[in-house]
């Protein structure tokens, strides 16, 4: 698929549903969108066909779901400088993994990681039970990965604690916009 034919311009983040039969892509056109695609062969993007897109506001950078697909999370920012109003957003879905059923697209739960001095939040990941959240950001030429604990898994209204960060500027990455872990959490991919 190509961005022009895919209905989502300037794609940034990508994720799949639990069985790989659906793919989701965030785009930064017109205030941030999420596109949903059906895959006739699981995890084979060459078999993708466009299903729907939903405007979610902000400039959507990355996307993740909780384990049962009833919550969708995006890393997004508002403002041309990228750093202003960076947020992690939590959207409730009435039907698992179906972006057309977002309960209240205009009022998602939000967490503002800038309270701990991060820059533009781009990447977003969770551990398997959602009690740890990871973000990537860019601040003044430095690229970092931040780790947070959530008192309740996959719940941005729970107590969120910043556990620390590492500077990855010298690792050969250039402003990573996404991150993900292997199933047992021993390997991180940027």
PLM feature segments, named:
Residues 1-190:
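Polar, enzyme-active/binding microenvironments
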